[in-house]
Amino acid sequence: MKMLNRSAISVKLRQPFVDWINSVSDSGEEEVTLDEVNQESTSYLVPELEEEEDLENLIEDRYLDILENELFSWEEDDSLWPEDMDRALFDEFIRIEPAFMVFDLDDQAPLLAQVLEEVEDFDAED
């Protein structure tokens, strides 16, 4: 087991986000609930956080990246996204749960990082 020099945040969606999901879904699809969307949540590794102020600063710096990623995971057409992509919308749509200490339980496989844009570029070549 290795302690990572990172913290993590988990994204939990709030009811207004779920309402938005249901508003952009095809009319024939069954609506999703808050409990359903939060059964699995996105986790982000972030620089080490030592106190709540660090978390707030991180969110202030990266809220738009997180918000766009979460919206994209439900709807790829960004013309259907909310117009005002600001911190107020982030706070209305998303709740963050921090994990200040992160451990890697896999003793064998090294962590592999690949920039998302590189993956998208590779997929575009196929």
What is each stretch, according to the model?
Residues 1-79:
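Short helix/strand-capping turn motifs
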Residues 48-119:
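Amphipathic protein-protein interaction modules
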